Amino acid sequence: MNRIEERLAALKEEGKKAFITYTTAGLPDYDTTKKIMFAQEKAGIDIMEIGVPFSDPIADGPVIQDASFKAIQNGASLEGTFTMMGKVRKAGLNSPVVFMLYYNTVYHYGVENFVNKCIENGVDGLIIPDLPFEEQGEIKDVLAKNEKSPILIQLVSPVSKGRIPMLLENARGFVYCVSQMGVTGKGAN
């Protein structure tokens, strides 16, 4: 069991739900992101979702796109985000951390190198919104090589009713339920 599974099991035993936050890494800078992470842990959040800045975040709406763009302008990168993660773990951050990023980032870094860096820096889970279940073979094979690998969080969308049982059967930790079609953070809903 990793930190995500441990936290969720404890919450289930207490009859509580998980409170999961989202923060864009490196916005406005990594020092601020680290402070935000420790403040969230102190406030009692259950799981932190850290968005790895990407130049073309197609599943995200204007707010997260803008945050990602500004973070990149300020020097944020995957390597910098890994370094930040290593520092917060060494400084005592115990909360589960999930990276939300796009598969292009993983692919260009090299899947095996990426997973090894996640393990080395204490990343507990991955949300990869542009990687459908049917195309997860390579990363799943690499993740399966090490019990300390992060959990690959499955996304379940409103149009996938026939796929829901398959996705749930293959899920670990939690599932990311897409509540509406389209990009996140767009409109008044």
Model-derived features: where do they sit?
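Active-site mouth loops of central-metabolism enzymes
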Residues: F19-T33, V98-G110, I151-V159, G187-A188
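N-terminal small/glycine-rich loop or linker at the start of catalytic domains
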Residues: R7-L27, G61-A67, V88-M100
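Conserved, mostly hydrophobic/aromatic
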Residues: T21, Q40, G51, C118, ...
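Glycine-enriched alpha-helix->loop->beta-strand junction motifs that scaffold or abut catalytic
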Residues: G44, C118-D124, A144-L152, N170-C177
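Conserved beta-strand positions in the central sheet of alpha/beta enzyme cores
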Residues: I20, D46-E49, I127, V175-Y176
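Active-site rim beta-loop-alpha module in soluble metabolic enzymes
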Residues: E169-N189
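Catalytic cores of alpha/beta
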Residues: Y30-E41, V159-N170
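Active-site-adjacent beta->alpha loops and helix N-cap segments on the catalytic face
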Residues: M1-L11, F54-Q65, A76-G86, V106-N113, ...
